Amino acid sequence: KRDEFNEPMDGLVYGVVVSLGFATYENYTYVYEWASTIAKEENLDFLEFSYLVAKGRSYSAIPMHGLNGAVMGYYFGLYAFSGNKKYLALSLILPYLFHGFYNFLGWPNMMIVIIVLLTLSLILHSNLQNLQLKKKKEQEVKKI
């Protein structure tokens, strides 16, 4: 075991950090490279268009990547401490499906994506609270 990864919650934290790092890179490419190309092709003001792209992605893509990283890290953390390969599979499959759902809906249905992301965040938060309570009870039993 490592001090840096000594409970399932650590997987969630690391997953979110990595996913938001990736989201930063991806947003850079969308805001500066993709928006620049589209602005030139459509004869739009680059700064105005790139601002709109950045603003839109800040409410959709960034939370989506953060949630996917949390889901991936949560299930990977469970796998790391249980050895159950079902959790390893879920750590890969669920973010893949959520991202595919996000891409499928796209901008016209973005409110649906936001509602789904919020719902999944609440479910994940509830599961984490249960895990933390379980760990706290285990630690109290060890003290006795």
Feature names for model-found ranges:
Residues 1-144:
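Hydrophobic alpha-helical segments at protein termini of multi-pass membrane proteins
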